[in-house]
Amino acid sequence: MAPIKKRNQQNQPNINERIRFPKIRVVDADGTQLGIMAPSEAMEIADERNLDLVLVSDKADPPVCRVMDYGKFKFEQEKKAREAKKKQHTSDVKEVKMRYKIQTHDYEVRVNHAKRFLKSGDKVKATVTFRGREIQHSHLAEALLKKMANDLLDFAEIQQAPKREGRNMIMYLSPKK
């Protein structure tokens, strides 16, 4: 059975007295190697400088520890995580709706909307809706969607070919990488 960890120690890295290795490689705050020594010696060095001993890599042989200010280190890590989160872009699915009897100008407007969506990194769902007996002309809707895919060839690749779903014909486009 695994030992029970205290709640506040679960996700914290090994620092200071929590480092339980017979020998460790110690690196100074500015990156200079201080050598291989016992953790107690490294703790004395860290205490002299009013800094913490932080385990950086336990996979190395011997494990690598750094003498640094742990509070500052933790703040920097959180700051990097926030920056990385800001730079992430989640791609949404934007929809462009039309009918198969669409006029030329209206069609061009829909294509321009789709271009804008694709340039911003979003996927596009092109939908052609049918009303009443229009569903008999699904081949015209398929031709329209293929024309749209052809017009957007520079910006998109077809993720899902035109497919009929109920009273709609749908095609998915994703931005080119």
Swiss-Prot record:
GO molecular function: ribosome binding; translation initiation factor activity
GO-annotated cellular components: cytosol; membrane
Residue ranges that the Swiss-Prot or TrEMBL entry lists as coiled coil: none
Locations listed in the record: Cytoplasm
Family per record: Belongs to the IF-3 family.
Subunit structure: Monomer.
A GO BP entry: ribosome disassembly
Keyword annotations from UniProtKB, A to Z: Cytoplasm, Initiation factor, Protein biosynthesis
Gene from which this protein is expressed: infC
Protein name from the UniProt record: Translation initiation factor IF-3
Function field: IF-3 binds to the 30S ribosomal subunit and shifts the equilibrium between 70S ribosomes and their 50S and 30S subunits in favor of the free subunits, thus enhancing the availability of 30S subunits on which protein synthesis initiation begins.
Predominant cellular place of this UniProt entry's protein: cytoplasm
Presence of the UniProt keyword Acetylation in the record: no
Domain of life per record: Bacteria
Disulfide bonds: none
SUPFAM superfamilies, sorted: Translation initiation factor IF3, C-terminal domain, Translation initiation factor IF3, N-terminal domain
InterPro entries for the chain: T_IF-3_C_sf, T_IF-3_N_sf, Translation_initiation_fac3_CS, Translation_initiation_fac_3, Translation_initiation_fac_3_C, Translation_initiation_fac_3_N
